[in-house]
C-alpha cells in the first residue's frame, strides 16, 4: 500500500539525481522516510519517465493491449470447451466408419477438410492407406466372427450381384439380417458357390432364385452332405423372383393394351374431325370399330390373365384366402388349374417356376416345424387360426365397423383357445415364432443388393477388402427402426461378443495393418535402392 504521495516521490528523485551533497538526507527527513526509499523512488520515477518518452508504447496503450489479450484469451477458453478432440486415431476411425457407410474417399477427404481445415486435413493418399488397412483388418476380424456365427446361421437367402461384370456372392440370414457371405468371385459357377457354402455347416434351409450356377452349387452341397452323413440342406425357390417375372409379363401385356387403346382413340379423333369438317366418314367408322375391337380384345385378355394370376398367387402365400393354413396339395391344385390358362411363350418361365417342386418347400418346412411342437392337433389349429386373425386386425387408427367385427372374431377365437388349454399363451408363442419366421422369399438378400448398388455408385470399384469393411460395419450397425430396433445383426443372431462396437473390433487389427504396411514399404524401397 502506498503511504508517501507521488509529489514526494518526484522530490526524492530530484534530490537523488540532481541535488547537492546532503540533499538525500534532507529530503528523507522532509518526507519522513528512509534514505533507501529515496533511492527506490528515484529509480522508479526515472524508469517511468523513460518508458513514457522513450519512443515505445505508452502505458495507456499497454493497458489497452493487455485488456485485448485478456478478452482473446477468454474467448479461446470458451471455444476450447466447445471443441472436439480430433487426433490421428480419431481421423482413422472417421474414415473407417464413413467407408463402411458407403462414403467415397473423396467425400471423406472433403468432410475431414471441413472439420480440420484444408491444411491440417490428411491427404487423399493417406486416407487411401487408412482405407486399405481398414479393409485388411476387417477381413481378419470377419474370419473370427464368421467362425463364431456358423452355429447360428440356420437359414440363408442367397443371390449374386454384378460389379464391372464380376459377380459378388451374397448371403443373408433373414431373421437377424446378418450378412454372412460377401465374396467377390471370378465366376458364379456351381463349384464357386459350393466352395463358399460348405463352410456354413449349420445351414438347414436356403432360398434363392433359379440361377443355374447357384442351383448347381446348392445341389453339389447337398450331395456332399449326404456323402459325409450330414443332414442335407433344404432348398426353396424364391417367391419374390416368381412374382417379379409375372409382373414383367403383365407389364408387357399392359403396354400392348395402352398401344392399341391409343390407336383406337386416334381413329376416333380422326372420325370426329371429319364430322366437324362436314366430310364423309364412310369407311372411317369401320376402321374405328376394328381399332376398338382390337383394343377391347387385348384389354380383356389382360384382365383374364391378371385374374388367373391373382388366384394362383394365393398358392404362394402362407394362408389361404379363408384363413386356413396353406399346404402343398392345395397350392399344387391351384397351379394345376392355372397352367392351361397361362398359355403362350411369354408365360413359359412363369409356368416353369410354378411347376418347380421347390416353389412350395417353405410350406413343407412350415408344417414340419409345427408338427415338431408336439401340440394336440385341435389346439395347434386353433392357435394358428388365432395368429391369422390377429394379423387381420386393423391398426388402432382404423375405427371401422369391419375392424370391430374382426376384433370380436379374434376375441371369440381367443376364448376358444383358453377353453382348450388354460396355459395356451406359451404354446401360442411357440406357434407364432414358427409362423413369423417362415421364409418364402429372398427379400433380405435383395435388400442387401440394394445397399451394395448404392455403395457401388459412390465408389469407383468395390474391392474384396472394401466389401469386408462394409460387411463388418453392417453386422455391427444398430437398427434405428422396425422390429429389430435397438440391436445390431450380430446381437439378433445370438452371437456373444465382448463388444459390438465397430471401431472397437477393428482398431487393433487396423493399427497392426498400418504398421505392417510401413514395414512392407520400407522393404520395397530398400530393394529398389539396392
Sequence positions of predicted segments:
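Active-site proximal helix-loop segment of RNase H-like, two-metal nucleases, encompassing DDE(D)
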Residues: 49, 252-270, 434, 444-462, ...
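Mobile genetic element proteins and their domesticated derivatives, centered on retroelements
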Residues: 12-13, 27, 38-41, 95, ...
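C-terminal domain-tail junction helix/linker
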Residues: 303, 310-314, 377-389, 395, ...
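Inter-helix linker motif
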Residues: 223-255, 259
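Short alpha-helical "recognition helix" segments of helix-turn-helix
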Residues: 23-32, 108, 112
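RNase H-like nuclease fold core
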Residues: 68-225, 252-256, 267-270, 282-291, ...
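Short, solvent-exposed alpha-helical "recognition" segments
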Residues: 39-58, 129-140
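Short, amphipathic alpha-helical "recognition" segments used to contact nucleic acids or chromatin
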Residues: 2-22, 84-103
Amino acid at each position: 500500500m502506498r503511504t508517501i504521495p507521488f509529489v514526494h516521490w518526484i522530490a526524492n528523485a530530484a534530490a537523488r539525481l540532481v541535488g547537492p551533497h546532503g540533499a538525500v538526507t534532507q529530503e528523507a527527513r522532509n518526507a519522513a522516510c528512509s534514505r533507501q526509499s529515496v533511492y527506490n523512488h528515484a529509480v522508479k520515477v526515472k524508469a517511468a519517465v523513460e518508458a513514457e518518452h522513450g519512443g515505445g508504447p505508452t502505458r495507456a496503450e499497454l493497458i489497452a493491449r493487455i485488456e485485448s489479450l485478456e478478452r482473446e484469451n477468454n474467448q479461446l477458453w470458451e471455444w476450447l470447451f466447445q471443441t472436439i478432440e480430433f487426433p490421428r486415431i480419431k481421423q482413422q476411425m472417421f474414415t473407417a466408419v464413413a467407408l463402411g457407410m458407403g462414403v467415397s474417399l473423396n467425400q471423406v477427404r472433403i468432410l475431414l477438410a471441413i472439420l480440420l481445415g484444408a491444411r491440417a486435413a490428411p491427404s487423399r493418399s493417406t486416407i487411401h492407406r487408412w482405407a486399405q488397412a481398414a479393409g485388411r483388418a476387417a477381413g481378419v476380424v470377419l474370419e473370427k466372427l464368421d467362425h463364431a456365427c456358423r452355429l447360428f446361421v440356420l437359414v440363408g437367402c442367397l443371390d449374386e450381384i454384378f460389379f464391372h461384370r464380376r459377380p459378388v456372392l451374397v448371403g443373408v440370414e433373414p431373421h437377424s439380417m446378418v450378412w454372412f457371405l460377401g465374396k467377390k468371385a471370378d465366376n458364379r459357377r456351381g463349384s464357386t458357390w459350393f466352395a463358399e457354402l460348405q463352410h456354413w455347416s449349420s445351414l438347414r434351409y436356403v432360398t434363392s432364385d433359379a440361377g443355374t450356377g447357384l442351383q448347381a452349387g446348392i445341389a453339389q452341397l447337398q450331395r456332399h452332405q449326404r456323402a459325409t452323413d450330414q443332414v442335407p440342406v433344404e432348398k426353396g425357390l424364391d417367391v419374390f423372383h416368381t412374382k417379379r417375372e409375372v409382373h414383367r409379363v403383365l407389364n408387357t401385356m399392359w403396354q400392348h393394351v395402352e398401344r392399341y387403346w391409343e390407336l383406337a382413340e386416334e381413329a376416333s379423333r380422326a372420325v370426329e374431325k371429319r364430322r366437324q369438317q362436314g366430310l364423309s366418314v364412310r369407311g372411317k367408322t369401320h376402321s374405328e370399330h376394328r381399332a376398338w375391337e382390337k383394343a377391347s380384345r387385348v384389354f380383356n385378355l389382360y384382365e383374364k390373365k391378371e385374374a388367373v394370376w391373382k388366384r394362383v398367387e394365393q398358392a404362394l402365400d402362407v394362408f389361404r384366402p379363408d384363413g386356413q393354413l396353406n399346404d402343398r396339395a392345395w397350392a399344387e391344385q391351384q397351379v394345376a388349374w392355372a397352367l392351361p390358362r397361362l398359355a403362350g411363350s411369354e408365360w413359359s418361365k412363369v409356368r416353369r417356376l410354378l411347376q418347380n417342386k421347390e416353389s412350395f418347400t417353405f410350406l413343407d418346412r412350415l408344417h414340419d416345424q409345427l408338427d415338431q411342437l408336439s401340440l394336440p392337433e385341435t389346439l395347434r389349429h386353433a392357435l394358428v387360426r388365432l395368429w391369422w386373425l390377429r394379423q387381420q386386425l386393423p391398426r388402432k387408427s382404423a375405427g371401422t365397423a369391419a375392424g370391430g367385427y374382426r376384433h370380436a372374431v379374434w376375441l371369440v377365437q381367443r376364448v376358444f383357445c383358453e377353453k382348450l388349454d388354460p396355459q395356451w399363451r406359451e404354446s401360442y408363442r411357440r406357434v407364432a415364432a414358427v409362423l413369423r419366421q417362415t421364409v418364402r422369399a429372398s427379400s433380405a438378400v435383395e435388400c442387401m443388393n440394394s445397399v451394395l448398388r448404392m455403395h457401388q455408385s459412390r465408389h469407383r470399384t468395390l474391392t474384396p477388402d472394401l466389401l469386408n469393411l462394409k460387411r463388418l460395419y453392417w453386422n455391427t450397425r444398430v437398427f434405428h427402426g422396425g422390429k429389430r430396433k435397438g440391436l445390431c445383426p450380430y446381437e439378433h443372431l445370438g452371437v456373444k461378443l465382448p463388444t459390438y462396437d465397430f471401431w472397437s473390433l477393428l482398431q487393433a487389427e487396423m493399427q497392426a495393418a498400418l504398421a505392417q504396411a510401413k514395414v512392407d514399404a520400407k522393404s520395397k524401397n530398400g530393394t529398389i535402392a539396392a
